[in-house]
Amino acid sequence: MTKSQNVDPAEIKKFEDMASRWWDLEGEFKPLHQINPLRLNYVLEKTEGLFGKKVLDVGCGGGILAESMAVEGAVVTGLDMGKEPLEVARLHALETGTKLDYIQSTIEDHAEQNPQAYDVVTCMEMLEHVPDPQSVITACSKLVKPGGHVFFSTLNRNFKSYLFAIVGAEKLLKIVPEGTHDHEKFIRPAELIKMIDNTPLQELGITGLHYNPLTDTYRLGTNVDVNYIVHTQNLTQ
């Protein structure tokens, strides 16, 4: 598989078809809007703030996380392969007066052209949508400066995550559109950490993301059975 081929056209089309609804707080991307404050605060805490730092958001989609990091004073670049979501992201940034850049490119190509260019790299809810997650993780490690931070979030692969993320979220509660996820592409924490260990990155912490269907709210916690975030740092000199 070459650098430019680590893309699933069906995955790109899936999110392009929903592009116009990225910023609908009650639409298909409502869960991303709900968890965004948690993700943002986690990144802010672990990096001791983003003001003035160069940040790359990989698989940025319509720009929900990217734009919120720019509001915190970061110099943000959003990266995605979907043309339609990027157009929505640019338009929303224009409407809100938020300054950031968006680029249509694979992470591998961007890493080749921008080695050690960023203080912080975020790769949220993206690894489970590509054919070769190791390639993405390696590229992220090349993009971050020595001492810089990289964050990965994805879904665990087990029976509980199938019940919660596929049966519950997609089929019963209709929180996200049916077919959004493929359970076989979910990644166990041990598998993700093994891929991280193949790079200069070092895993510093892992936290779970929990959904309460009774209150329709999310919180961070120690259980990583379904959604989880891994914090890593490039500790090379």
Swiss-Prot record:
Keyword Ubl conjugation belongs to the record: no
Binding-site residues, S-adenosyl-L-methionine: R39, G59, D80, M124
Reactions that this protein is recorded to catalyse: a 3-demethylubiquinol + S-adenosyl-L-methionine = a ubiquinol + S-adenosyl-L-homocysteine + H(+); a 3-(all-trans-polyprenyl)benzene-1,2-diol + S-adenosyl-L-methionine = a 2-methoxy-6-(all-trans-polyprenyl)phenol + S-adenosyl-L-homocysteine + H(+)
Keywords from the named record: Methyltransferase, S-adenosyl-L-methionine, Transferase, Ubiquinone biosynthesis
UniProt keyword annotation of S-adenosyl-L-methionine present: yes
Broadest EC class assigned to this enzyme: transferase
EC number: 2.1.1.222, 2.1.1.64
Extent of the signal sequence: none
Family: Belongs to the methyltransferase superfamily. UbiG/COQ3 family.
NCBIfam families: UbiG
Reported function: O-methyltransferase that catalyzes the 2 O-methylation steps in the ubiquinone biosynthetic pathway.
This protein's name: Ubiquinone biosynthesis O-methyltransferase
Biological source species: Vibrio atlanticus (strain LGP32)
